[in-house]
Amino acid sequence: FDGDDDDFSFHLGYFKDEELICIASFHQKQRENFDGKGYQLRGMATKPEFQGRGVGNELLNFAIVYLRGVKANYLWCNARKVAFRFYLSLGFEFISDEFIMEGIGPHRAMYLKIQ
């Protein structure tokens, strides 16, 4: 994606033994109508056989600790409908109505206040 190699973008991976089982990409980007330093979670995926085991939760919590360290104020994402419950369980809140991302399906913007 555009911006993936920017100085203020970062990418995380969760390994089990030597197998990459979960990834997440973050990009410093302010959300419209939000103040402060924002980061967008631009993509996250976990191998199907490892879903529901807390791997994504651990990876995202690691990212949140890092974002506190770089003085980010909030993290936001365009969450797929099937992932709403996951993000809500981490403290994210809805900040938009449902919308369709062409070729992917229903989404809602969500955010988490970091500091």
Task: Give the residues covered by each predicted segment.
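Conserved acetyl-CoA pyrophosphate-binding loop and the N-cap/start of the following alpha-helix
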Residues: 50, 54-62
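Conserved active-site tyrosine of GNAT-family acetyltransferases
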Residues: 87, 92
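Conserved short alpha-helix immediately C-terminal to the canonical SAM/SAH-binding motif I
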Residues: 59, 83-86
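A conserved beta-turn-beta hairpin within the catalytic core of GNAT-like acetyltransferases
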Residues: 29-41, 51, 104-107
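Short loop/turn motifs at secondary-structure junctions and domain boundaries
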Residues: 2-7
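Conserved beta-strand in the GNAT
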Residues: 13, 19-29, 40-45
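Conserved GNAT acetyl-CoA-binding A-motif
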Residues: 67-80
